[in-house]
């Protein structure tokens, strides 16, 4: 009897210890690995990158939902290309990280906000190229998990009915673009289909262009499906003169227009 009580006490102690470890402060956990060299070798091979404080972040260090991780950055100088790489995300191409998007802002400073998927604790790299071909970067570590391979209840009819639906909200200096799209990355399990397709094939936005009275504010190409389902793009711009026009294209070649 005493032996049984002792065993039970040890089990309870082990459970409590596991719970304490799970909710321990971030500083107690192992440091997030930095794979910047692998990212450079995969996407910017042969380029020399200089760290820059002109690229800043406004993010939470931990996100509870790996499928919807808020990510916001500001590029204070003018750059012709800005790439966002999630180092810890899988991708069909070999190497480190998933290139979430490459942007081409026409204004500076440029503040951009969206939600991304994260499969594991990871550094997010923002790598910018100026008009002279010089490359700069900054990075931030965020803790989250399970966002790329998480299963989902998938209603194909509902998705096809709403896909591409847009809403554009704007003030004179700030705008938000909402696009209905499943953003499948090729790793998600279809939990609602027990006899047919189990892994949902890759299907996500491939490009977006935002214009103000035919003058482009920014455009972007997307890769790897690291941008979250039903993406929202929030950005700042100098005085917006008219109603914004948005053209989005996905990996199936479908075009969607919003204004």
State the predicted function of each range.
Residues 32-160, 164-171, 176-259:
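A general "mature secreted/periplasmic domain" signal
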Residues 24-30:
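Sec/Tat signal peptide C-region and signal peptidase I cleavage site
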Residues 9-10, 27, 134-139:
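Short secondary-structure capping/junction motifs at helix and strand boundaries
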Residues 14-24:
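Bacterial N-terminal signal peptides
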Residues 5-15:
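Bacterial N-terminal signal peptides that target proteins for export
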